[in-house]
Regions:
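The feature captures the beta-strand-to-loop junction immediately N-terminal to the Walker
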Residues: 33-35
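H-loop/switch region of ABC-family ATPase nucleotide-binding domains
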Residues: 197-198
Length: 216
């Protein structure tokens, strides 16, 4: 369970999140909506333990997430196995020397057996249509190929919670059609989805509730 209690966050003196209180139950699909600059991306970074409330608390499965907690290597590893983050711009997410290495990075950090890692990577490459690109450096890919690689790199970790910032960005028509099938399959598998998007119409009946992020 994710619990936000009176969460506030500001950049310099500019309030971004203001007294946000919300509970997200396991298996729910939540749409984060609001205008550009309202704090949707900031909230996603906070949910991933990259930044922390300046007031109030964020709890994940009953544990309050703080900078000190995330400096605990064992806890940070446990947390990041359970919460995955697909960035809006895949260039912010991809850093390995090949697509295959990108998809293997998370499972390697999780300590999975080599055979299990290969299976996860091969399955994700096939599902995302990336098999022919497996040896390519991510920087040589098109925007849509990068975005699919970014999604696949989270898929191989199989997190319980998927946080996504504009997951449809960079995708072409075929990629969007694939995404519209993929997201319901995650929900059917019991995953929690937290999606920032300006395209609620594409999410249809997937969404259980909408959280309007209003900034200050």
């Amino acid at each position: 369970m994710i619990q936000l209690d009176d969460v506030c966050f500001a950049y310099d003196d500019r309030p971004i999140l203001s007294h946000l209180t919300e509970t997200i139950e396991p298996g729910q699909a939540v749409l984060l909506s609001g205008p550009n600059g309202s704090g949707k991306s900031t909230l996603l970074r906070l949910l991933n333990g990259l930044i922390f409330p300046q007031q109030g608390t964020y709890s994940f499965d009953g544990t309050i997430i703080t900078a000190g907690k995330m400096r605990d290597h064992a806890y940070s590893k446990w947390f990041h196995q359970r919460v995955g983050y697909v960035w809006q711009n895949p260039n912010s997410q991809l850093f390995c020397s090949s697509v295959r290495e990108e998809l293997a990075f998370g499972p390697v950090q999780m300590g999975l057996k080599p055979a299990d890692i290969r299976q996860r990577v091969d399955d994700a490459l096939e599902l995302l249509g990336l098999t022919r690109l497996a040896s390519r450096p991510p920087y040589t890919l098109s925007g849509g190929e990068k975005k699919r690689t970014a999604i696949a790199s989270i898929l191989t970790m199989n997190p319980q919670v998927w946080t996504m910032d504009e997951p449809e960005s960079y995708l072409d028509a075929d990629g969007l059609a694939w995404l519209e099938d993929f997201l319901p399959s995650l929900k059917a598998a019991g995953k929690t989805l937290i999606i920032a998007s300006h395209h609620a119409d594409r999410l249809g009946s997937l969404i259980d509730k909408e959280l309007v992020v209003r900034g200050s």
